[in-house]
Amino acid sequence: TIQEITPEFKGNTELKEGDDIICLTPLAGLPLFLEDITSVDMGYGQIKCRGYVICFESVQLVKQEDFKGEESKYLLRALEVEGSLCRVSRELKRMKPSKSLIIGANPVEAMFYAKIASDSNVGSVDNILVMDSSYSHIYEKESLEKAFGKLAARIYFVDLSTPMEASQILFAGENGQLADVVVNLESIEGAETLANCIVKDNGMVCYTGMSDNYTKGLLIADCFGKEVNHCTLDGYEKEAYPFAVSLINGLLPELFMLDKLMNRADLKKNFAEVKRKERTKNAARKIDDFIYMS
């Protein structure tokens, strides 16, 4: 909520004191003081807190007029990956894929991309969701299938740290059919190998995170002798807010059902196993000469 606007402020002049707003600029780049953290949502990667932020004129701010209250977490999660969602949506509408595969670290984010893929070629897209086997301890396959509904034709749990063995499971399950597009949301080393292994020649692999081994994926595609279009993480998009609102409006029933599943799941107990896999080989958090913060 806006507490004060200085007379010299030349940013979004439509905003006024008392407005509820969403900041599309990463908070890591702004002066921030936290008084208290009241709750942590492990499923959506969000915290509720009290404090203050100083927003400059260059900061991208929008007035929150949609999905207030408990539903705001859906919108905030979509806006967290705003640029990637918008870019992948444009690419898929251009491609009109018949088969997409999503390597998902988080069911919510995976659902966003499944919806985007489905909307890119309505009624003609076969969405496959792949998750690391460590998640099978907290998410029942049948419950995930029920939550995703028509957004996921099939769901697989495989060991992403052994990508060649995982690819054999997928080849067998999909009768040898490769995907037109693969969206890699996972940071576990090996996911990028699996992505390039199961994408078609002249297909596309989308990398959506800071730690998804993008450059290694380029080398792997070359080793497989495939011509692959690599779509990378993107940043701020002017149309991010209306795009996210439209996306969430089309996903509310599925998100409500996914919430019920995540509320039953013990998300904390899976973190140790996932982090162990993330730290394999290059344990110092250094990947392809880029250092990123955890």
Regions found by a protein language model. Give the residues of each.
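Adenosine-nucleotide cofactor-binding segment
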Residues: S118-G190
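Glycine-rich beta-strand-centered segment in the early N-terminal region that forms part
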Residues: T1-G29
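Short helix-loop-beta connector
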Residues: L92-S100, G176, D201
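Conserved S-adenosyl-L-methionine
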Residues: K96, S118-I128, D201-N202, K226
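NAD(P)H dinucleotide-binding glycine-rich loop of Rossmann-like/cofactor-binding domains
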Residues: I22-P97
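C-terminal hydrophobic helical "lid"/dimerization subdomain
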Residues: E237-S294
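Glycine-rich phosphate-binding loop and adjacent beta-alpha segment
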Residues: E186-G250
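Hydrophobic beta-strand signal
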Residues: I21-C23, L101, C206, C231
